[in-house]
Amino acid sequence: MNPTASSTYAAGDAAGYELQMGRWSRRLAPGFVDFTEIEAARRIIDVGCGTGHLSLALVRSPRVEHVTGIDLSTAYVEHARSRSDDSRLEFVVGDACRLPFPDGWFDHSASMLVLQFVPDADAAVREMRRVTRRGGTVAAATWDSRGGLVFLRVIVDTAAVVDPDADRLRAKLLSQPLTRPGDLRRCWGNAGLLDVTQDMLTVRMDFECFADFWAPCEGQEGPLAAYVGRLSTDGRTRLRALVQRAYLDGEPDGPRSYAATAWMVKGKVP
């Protein structure tokens, strides 16, 4: 799926997404669910469900009766469906900015690591509020791309030193919607949600070696892979060598663990 008016993320390879970001979504989801305090519900919607990590975390509670995950990417939805035979889970293809559900249909709505890729994120949040009943929770999480995503800075800061195109990519990635301090709180307030609370959650991104760290850049999923894929063979070889130096930081190749911090917000529908 190419970028659209509703998403700047080129999604199409579910396995590639799992390698690039899904494995970290899996780590983030339980803590985000704890933050939402959603423990019981007849119906919950996971907006921009991707490959299903948040939906799977939500149904860990036996008091959650049904979770609908919705995503623009057919490939992601099919992958999510394949991950569980839990009858409480449903995954459908659809647009976060035009949710195909009536007003107040869900008890709660949540979105994880998605809104930063929605050009009109305010519209998506308004839709989340619309389909959530009065008194229900609307919650979201986005990466702190500039100050809290070490793996990203290792790559884009290195690339930006030697390539103006990478410098422009860095500027784009570090200025995505709803990734700066206070952005989510302001957005939730503008949407008319009440009792708005913002917090942070940090997980660890653990890599076995540099090859594990670099592998997503050689794939086909996400903005980093797209950038690397446009480079010449010599350009890719040069960039890989430079990023490897940054990863090794003077020590032998092997495991590295980087912090990854997400902003989280929740509010109530009046």
Task: List PLM regions with ranges.
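Conserved Class I S-adenosyl-L-methionine
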Residues: P3-S6, A10, W24, T51-H53, ...
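Class I SAM-dependent methyltransferase Rossmann-like catalytic core
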Residues: A11-G22
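Conserved alpha-helix/loop element of class I SAM-dependent methyltransferases that forms part
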Residues: R23-R42, A57
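A generic alpha-to-beta junction signature in SAM-dependent methyltransferases
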Residues: T36-I38, P62, S84, T132
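Class I SAM-dependent methyltransferase SAM/SAH-binding core
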Residues: R43-L99, A123
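A short acidic, Gly/Pro-enriched loop at the edge of an enzyme's catalytic core
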Residues: C97-H108
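A short SAM/SAH-binding and catalytic strip from SAM-dependent methyltransferases
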Residues: D107-A121, D144
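Conserved catalytic/acceptor-binding region of the Class I
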Residues: D122, R129, R133-E208
